[in-house]
Structures are given as C-alpha cells and as structure tokens.
Amino acid sequence: MTFSYKRFLNLPKPTKEDFRGDRERILDALNMPDASMTLEALRSLYPLTARADYAVTVTLCPGDRGTDIIRVEPGDTTHRLLGLALDIGSTTLEMELVDMLTGQVLQNVGCVNSQV
C-alpha cells in the first residue's frame, strides 16, 4: 500500500499567452485535473514556484476520494520521503521515523503509557 509519493515537475513558466495559475500548472503537469490540494500546499505556491524557477516536487497522497497534493517543495526532493509510524499499545507507546523509499527505520523511541 502506498501512503504517499513524490513527483518532480518542470512546470512551464507563465507567458502572455499562458497565464494559468501555479495550481493549474501543477494539476496539468500531473495529468490529474481532479486532484485536490491542501490549504497549506496551496498557500506555499506563491512565491515558491517562481523562486524555484518552476522546478518543484509535489507530495501526493492517494485516498478514498482521489489524490491530495499535500506539499510542494522547491527543486527535486524525490530522493527524500519520511514517514512516522505510531504504535499506541495498552502499556507502551512506540514511534519510528521511517524512510518511506527504503523502509529503513531511521530513529525510534518508546515510553510507558502514563494512563496505565
């Protein structure tokens, strides 16, 4: 199961003839016209895309109601995708920072559940 993935995009720059917004450029480049974008990702677009010379990486998260764009970063960051795994047990809490591309656990921490 894929929880999220990244795609690097070289977006076309705006011109007098092509005045689409950055969101529309991203959706067109992904060929995902119905994808939604989180408010945080949407707010990050300006001036990020122009400063990155329209070369950006988007993080996508597939769900029951389609694909969400949850983050936009300048440049190509497809080599780095981290996730957090949580295990909330009846007696202990465990967390692991995971490299989602390799499955390698980078860090882990645990503690006794204080509600016990």
Residues covered by each model-derived region:
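Short glycine-rich, Thr/Ser-proximal phosphate-binding strand/loop in the N-terminal lobe
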Residues: L97-V116
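Nucleotide/phosphate-binding catalytic cleft detector across ATP-hydrolyzing
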Residues: M1-A85, S90, T102
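Extended, hydrophobic alpha-helical segments in both membrane/secreted and soluble proteins
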Residues: T91-M95
